[in-house]
Regions:
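N-terminal export signals
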Residues: 1-17
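Soluble non-cytosolic domains of exported or imported proteins
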Residues: 32, 61-64, 130-134, 172, ...
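Pocket-lining segment of extracytoplasmic ligand-binding domains
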Residues: 82-84, 171-280
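Conserved C-terminal helix/tail region of periplasmic/extracytoplasmic solute-binding proteins
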Residues: 316-380
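Short helix-capping/linker segments at secondary-structure and domain boundaries
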Residues: 6, 45-48, 148-150, 325-335
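Short, glycine-/small- and polar/acidic-enriched structural segments
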Residues: 18-169, 177-180, 184-197, 201-214, ...
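Secondary-structure end/capping motifs
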Residues: 230-338
């Protein structure tokens, strides 16, 4: 979506904002565990506890649908792939900012059962959820480290032995594509890796959080006009999301049930046991992943998915640097002129999450050291 292509949607956004200056919280989400804090906040009445109204979250099918619904103003609070926020603000000129991280980790590279090594993906196709995704960044790093090159070709096109064809698919389409051998792997958010395991159509080759420690996958993205014109409302939105993250960390099995098709709100089509495998895995599963090599950095003590809201600037800076060296289809010329430090300052508005953290005990409440700086650890 170019800046010109976004204009009609932005016109709709402006019209909606003018017509409804006190709009309630309208969440747009995909049926993935990335959405957990937003859905928990809605289910547990945390927005209402802050004194604001929230409509039932809107389930969308693809990342393209999520960003289009957001740009046009149909929804006003979304979880969005962190690289997509860079593309939206600087490539499509969308007036919106990151206000918090929604979760960390929570993604993996799943491959066909007969694939035992990343190098065996040479000459085959692997699906990604979106060109601007941490999945694409991490996958291409893994491919390079294994002597492979990412390419973008038509499905079925001839590939060299060291080429891996990247295809974009909605997350829900990935397990069927893997089962039918249309692709030989995919890298995506949970629970679609756990789903492949349950269906016995794939195995987890590597967790992304074991490549980039505590990386953000999805972040909370909000319209700039809400942040500027409704700062108190915006603060309450972020308060609710931060409290939802804390609740989820302490009620993982309950969260899996809440999000599942067995839950009262049926937020996702997933079974509780599939979501439980992600949110509340057993110790025996951790040992199995250590043995298989899906987890190589045991000392990182990464959870399959975890939650903490602070958007560390070092992550945004490193993400921008890596996006410049990542194969991305479409008009990506805007990336060349981006300054990582300036983007970290301009793309993110952390005043709301800092206040929200202060009210719940700071970063220590999430098991982190106080202070809003860290160093990025990336080790494929």
């Amino acid at each position: 979506l170019s800046a010109a292509g976004a204009l009609p949607l932005l016109s709709s956004l402006q019209a909606r904002a003018a017509a409804e200056p006190d709009a309630p919280v309208r969440i747009g989400y995909l049926p993935i565990t990335d959405a957990t804090p937003l859905l928990v906040a809605h289910a547990n009445g945390l927005f209402e506890a802050e004194g604001i109204q929230a409509e039932r979250p809107v389930l969308l099918r693809s990342w393209a649908q999520v960003i289009e619904a957001f740009i046009s103003g149909q929804v006003n609070v979304i979880h969005l792939l962190s690289p997509m926020t860079v593309w939206a603000r600087y490539g499509s000129k969308v007036p919106a900012k990151v206000v918090a991280w929604n979760h960390v980790g929570g993604s993996g590279l799943t491959v066909a059962p007969e694939i035992a090594d990343v190098r065996q993906l040479g000459g085959k196709s692997v699906a990604i959820p979106f060109w601007y995704s941490i999945h694409n960044v991490v996958l291409q790093q893994l491919l390079r480290d294994n002597g492979l090159r990412a390419v973008s070709r038509a499905v079925g096109a001839a590939l060299a032995a060291d080429e891996v064809n990247l295809v974009v698919l909605p997350p829900s389409d990935m397990p069927p594509a893997l089962a039918s051998k249309r692709i030989h792997g995919y890298i995506v958010a949970e629970p679609f890796n756990a789903l492949a395991e349950n269906l016995k159509v794939g195995r987890v080759q590597r967790f992304t959080g074991d490549v980039w420690r505590n990386h953000a996958c999805c972040v909370v993205f909000m319209h700039e006009h809400d942040l500027e014109r409704r700062p108190q409302w915006s603060q309450k939105v972020v308060n609710a999301i931060v409290k939802a993250q804390l609740w989820t960390r302490e009620h993982r099995a309950e969260a899996a049930q809440l999000l599942s098709k067995a839950g009262a709100n049926r937020y996702t089509p997933h079974a509780p046991e599939v979501l439980g495998r992600v949110l509340a895995p057993g110790a025996e599963e951790q040992q199995a992943y250590l043995a298989s090599g899906a987890i190589r950095h045991a000392d990182w003590q990464e959870r399959r998915i975890d939650f903490q809201p602070y958007p560390y600037p070092s992550y945004t800076e490193e993400l921008v640097r890596r996006l410049k060296d990542t194969l991305i289809e479409g008009n990506n010329a805007f990336l060349a002129s981006l300054d990582p430090r300036q983007v970290a300052s301009d793309l993110v508005d952390d005043r709301f999450v800092r206040q929200a953290l202060a009210e719940v005990g700071g970063l220590q409440a999430f098991g982190l050291a106080e202070g809003f700086q860290r160093s990025e650890e990336i080790s494929p």
